[in-house]
């Protein structure tokens, strides 16, 4: 590689800027690598397909680096090579300031850079590649409890914690990153990210937060698991030691909010994805499965009662287009399950609570607290 290419490398000191700014990255790893984990602003344009990468990897183990490189060149040559380069050029036309990387910032990055240079495009590659950048994000997450004081927003189910968080610059929305609302009814239509992608998104969100004027890190009160997304241990332990504020909301407002979240939004989302009939069936299945997921904690009798109430409410919705009947089972679910569970959990944190109030009072208190 010539001196020009050596100079055209983005150093590790730039990781924070690249990730926090959402700078476009052309990821030339194989699709299987990208699927396991990637960064929010990256796009997969592989040098080798999965099968080609596997062949080269086997050759490397059995015959060494030189033989593996030779095999790689024989697999990606001629028309195949031109197709790959054309795909890269199309991406770079749309993202002319993009960087590129492979897993370690090694041979694949260098070869891609060389082929692009031969095609007249000068594209820097990132030192250390995906592996080093991911480690940078893991370190960012682990150091977050010391980077800025954490403050935990708690509140009974339906109190509007997520809506509140989204109005605050001090906040990072963990449930949004996990694509899950953190309860039995918390599933999103599009499903959850892989654990690695959840961690990558969390790391990027924390980098953005640390580069903002915010003096505290406001987080919703979460368990270790948000759906199937696990909070990294050091980060979760920091949350467990942080001060707590409690968001209060009257029962009627909570019921209205949960009717909108559990019924209106979920029904609308399924219908938009699957059509009217299949969408309604998927929505009904979502409600039934959500109750079944907490059957052991509800007890058989309570579970069966709630399932029947849901069935009745769905029948009314089908016949008259009226969703108000759903309020009955939501109210019972709150009184028999969510509210007692919340009281038990918040009782264990009583010594960490430093404020409680409604949405307006909480905003006013935070405005003052965040500038201390």
Curated annotation (Swiss-Prot):
InterPro entries, per the entry: Rhodanese-like_dom, Rhodanese-like_dom_sf, SelU
Protein EC: 2.9.1.3
Record note on quaternary structure: Monomer.
Identification of the protein by name: tRNA 2-selenouridine synthase
Active site: 102 (s-selanylcysteine intermediate)
Annotated catalysed reactions: 5-methylaminomethyl-2-thiouridine(34) in tRNA + selenophosphate + (2E)-geranyl diphosphate + H2O + H(+) = 5-methylaminomethyl-2-selenouridine(34) in tRNA + (2E)-thiogeraniol + phosphate + diphosphate; 5-methylaminomethyl-2-thiouridine(34) in tRNA + (2E)-geranyl diphosphate = 5-methylaminomethyl-S-(2E)-geranyl-thiouridine(34) in tRNA + diphosphate; 5-methylaminomethyl-S-(2E)-geranyl-thiouridine(34) in tRNA + selenophosphate + H(+) = 5-methylaminomethyl-2-(Se-phospho)selenouridine(34) in tRNA + (2E)-thiogeraniol; 5-methylaminomethyl-2-(Se-phospho)selenouridine(34) in tRNA + H2O = 5-methylaminomethyl-2-selenouridine(34) in tRNA + phosphate
Similarity comment text for this entry: Belongs to the SelU family.
Domain Rhodanese, first and last residues per copy: 19-142
Keywords: Selenium, Transferase
Keyword Transferase: yes
Alphabetical list of SUPFAM superfamilies matching this protein: Rhodanese/Cell cycle control phosphatase
Top enzyme class: transferase
A Gene Ontology BP annotation from the UniProt entry: tRNA wobble uridine modification
HAMAP family cross-referenced by the UniProt entry: tRNA_sel_U_synth
Any one GO molecular-function label of the UniProt entry: transferase activity, transferring alkyl or aryl (other than methyl) groups
Known function: Involved in the post-transcriptional modification of the uridine at the wobble position (U34) of tRNA(Lys), tRNA(Glu) and tRNA(Gln). Catalyzes the conversion of 2-thiouridine (S2U-RNA) to 2-selenouridine (Se2U-RNA). Acts in a two-step process involving geranylation of 2-thiouridine (S2U) to S-geranyl-2-thiouridine (geS2U) and subsequent selenation of the latter derivative to 2-selenouridine (Se2U) in the tRNA chain.
Source lineage: Bacteria, Pseudomonadati, Pseudomonadota, Gammaproteobacteria, Alteromonadales
Family matches, as Gene3D superfamilies: Rhodanese-like domain
């Amino acid at each position: 590689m010539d001196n020009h290419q050596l100079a055209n490398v983005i150093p590790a000191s730039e990781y924070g800027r690249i990730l926090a700014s959402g700078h476009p990255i052309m990821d030339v790893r194989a699709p299987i690598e990208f699927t396991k984990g990637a960064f929010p602003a990256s796009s997969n344009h592989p040098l080798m397909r999965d099968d080609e990468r596997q062949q080269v990897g086997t050759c490397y183990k059995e015959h060494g680096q030189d033989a593996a490189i030779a095999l790689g060149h024989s697999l990606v040559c001629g028309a195949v090579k031109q197709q790959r380069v054309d795909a890269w050029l199309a991406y770079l036309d749309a993202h002319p300031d993009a960087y590129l990387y492979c897993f370690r910032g090694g041979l694949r990055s260098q070869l891609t850079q060389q082929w692009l240079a031969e095609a007249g495009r000068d594209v820097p590659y990132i030192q250390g590649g995906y592996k080093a950048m991911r480690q940078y994000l893991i370190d960012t997450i682990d150091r977050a409890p010391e980077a800025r004081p954490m403050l935990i927003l708690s509140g009974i189910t339906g109190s509007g914690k997520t809506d509140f968080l989204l109005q605050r610059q001090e906040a990072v929305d963990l449930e949004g990153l996990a694509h899950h609302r953190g309860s039995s009814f918390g599933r999103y239509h599009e499903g959850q990210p892989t654990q690695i992608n959840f961690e990558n998104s969390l790391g990027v969100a924390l980098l953005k937060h640390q580069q903002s004027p915010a003096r505290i890190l406001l987080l919703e009160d979460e368990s270790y698991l948000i759906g199937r997304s696990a909070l990294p241990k050091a980060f979760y332990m920091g949350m467990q030691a942080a001060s707590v504020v409690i968001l209060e909301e009257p029962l009627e407002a909570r019921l209205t909010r949960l009717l909108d979240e559990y019924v209106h939004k979920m029904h609308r989302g399924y219908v938009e994805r699957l059509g009217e009939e299949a969408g309604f069936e998927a929505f009904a299945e979502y409600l039934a499965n959500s109750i079944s997921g907490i059957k052991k904690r509800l007890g058989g009798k309570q579970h069966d009662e709630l399932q029947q109430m849901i069935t009745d409410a769905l029948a009314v919705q089908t016949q008259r287009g009226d969703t108000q009947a759903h309020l009955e089972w939501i109210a019972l679910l709150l009184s028999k399950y969510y509210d007692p569970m919340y009281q038990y959990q918040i009782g264990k944190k009583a010594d960490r609570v430093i404020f409680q109030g409604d949405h307006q009072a909480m905003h006013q208190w935070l405005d003052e607290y965040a500038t201390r």
